[in-house]
Design a protein with these regions (language model features):
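Membrane-embedded segments
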Residues: 41-137, 143
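Conserved beta-sheet core of the metallophosphoesterase superfamily
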Residues: 184-262
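Catalytic metal-binding/acid-base residues of hydrolase active sites
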Residues: 51, 81-82, 116-117, 141-142, ...
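Binuclear metal-dependent hydrolase catalytic cores centered on His/Asp/Glu-rich metal-binding motifs
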Residues: 126-134, 138-140, 146-181, 185-192, ...
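N-terminal membrane-anchoring alpha-helices
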Residues: 1-40
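Mobile, glycine- and charge-enriched loop segments
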Residues: 26-56, 169-175
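Active-site-proximal beta-strand elements of phosphoester/diester hydrolases
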Residues: 41-51, 150-158, 178-181, 236-241
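Short acidic-hydrophobic surface loop/beta-edge motif
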Residues: 30-37, 140-147, 228-232
Length: 264
C-alpha cells in the first residue's frame, strides 16, 4: 500500500536538500545572440549579484574562472558584491576585490553598485574595486573604441538606494550605447536609442515553481522583469538571474548564471 504522507515528506525533504544544498552551486552559462549590426562581433560577459558570504572564496574563484574562460571583449558586473542585510554575514570587499581583479578583457572591466553594496558602504566598495582595476560607473558613460567601431557604455546609479539619472548617464554619449544598471526597475526610463540594457537584482525570484514561476520578485513591476531577455516598446532588456542568494540561501528551478552576449 502506498503511504502518501511518507512520500510527500520524502519529496519535501528532497526539495529542501536540492534547493538549499545543491542548486545554488550549479552555475550555468546563458548565451544570448543579439542582432545589432553596429556591434557585430562584440562579445560581453555580464555577471551580477555575487552576494559573497564568508568562506565562499573557492566558489568566487570558480565564478571568476568561468567568466575568464569566455575570453570576452568586455566584462560587466551588475553589483551586489556583498551581502547587505543586517542578519547576513558578508565577505568583506577587501577580500572579494583581489579575486575579481583576476578578470581581464581587452575593452575593460566595468561595474555598477547594487543596493546591498550601498547598505554596507558603497563609497568604500567603489573605491576598493577601482583600486583593483574595475571601473565603477554611476550616472556616467565611457566611450569604448574597438576595431569594429566605437560604442558607449553608460552606468546608472541604483534606484533603490541612490538616484539614477538617465539623462546625465547618457550625456554626450553617441550611438550605439549599452546601459548597465543594478535593478531593472529603471528600464521604462531608458530611451529607445539604447541598444541593450543589462540588469540584475531580481535573482529570478530564487524559487520558481513549475507552472507558477517565481514566487517573489523584488521589483515594483512584479514578474515583468523577472529574468531573461524581455522586449518592450522597441527596447531590449537583459536581466540576469544572478549568482548568489539573499534572505535565504536557496534556489529552486532558478540556477545561478553567468550571462554571455554575442552581438551579430
Amino acid at each position: 500500500m502506498i503511504n502518501i504522507p511518507v512520500i510527500l515528506v520524502m519529496l519535501g525533504a528532497a526539495a529542501l536538500l536540492w534547493g538549499f544544498g545543491i542548486e545554488p552551486k550549479l552555475l550555468k552559462t546563458s548565451v544570448y545572440r543579439i542582432r545589432q549590426p553596429e556591434l557585430a562581433g562584440l562579445k560581453i560577459v555580464f555577471a551580477s549579484d555575487f552576494h559573497v558570504a564568508p568562506g565562499h572564496e573557492r566558489r568566487l574563484r570558480k565564478i571568476v574562472g568561468r567568466i575568464a574562460a569566455q575570453q570576452a571583449d568586455m566584462i560587466l558586473l551588475g553589483g551586489d558584491f556583498v551581502k547587505g542585510r543586517r542578519f547576513e554575514k558578508s565577505m568583506p570587499i577587501e577580500k572579494i576585490a583581489p579575486i575579481l581583479a583576476e578578470l581581464h578583457a581587452p575593452l575593460g572591466v566595468y561595474a555598477v553598485l547594487g543596493n546591498h553594496d550601498w547598505r554596507r558602504d558603497g563609497v568604500r566598495i567603489a573605491d576598493v574595486l577601482q583600486k583593483h582595476g574595475i571601473e565603477v560607473l554611476e550616472n556616467e558613460n565611457r566611450r569604448i573604441d574597438r576595431s569594429g567601431g566605437s560604442f558607449w557604455l553608460a552606468g546608472l546609479a541604483d534606484c533603490n538606494m541612490r538616484r539614477p539619472d538617465v539623462d546625465k548617464a547618457l550625456e554626450n554619449a553617441g550611438n550605439p550605447v549599452l546601459v548597465i544598471t543594478h535593478s531593472p526597475d529603471i528600464f521604462p526610463q531608458v530611451p529607445e536609442r539604447a541598444a541593450l540594457t543589462l540588469a540584475g537584482h531580481t535573482h529570478g525570484g530564487q524559487v520558481a515553481l513549475p507552472w507558477l514561476g517565481a514566487l517573489l520578485v523584488p521589483s515594483v513591476f512584479g514578474k515583468r522583469y523577472e529574468g531573461g531577455l524581455p522586449a518592450e516598446n522597441g527596447k531590449r532588456l537583459l536581466v540576469s538571474r544572478g549568482l548568489g542568494t539573499s534572505l535565504l540561501p536557496v534556489r529552486f528551478n532558478c540556477r545561478p548564471e553567468i550571462v554571455v552576449v554575442e552581438f551579430e
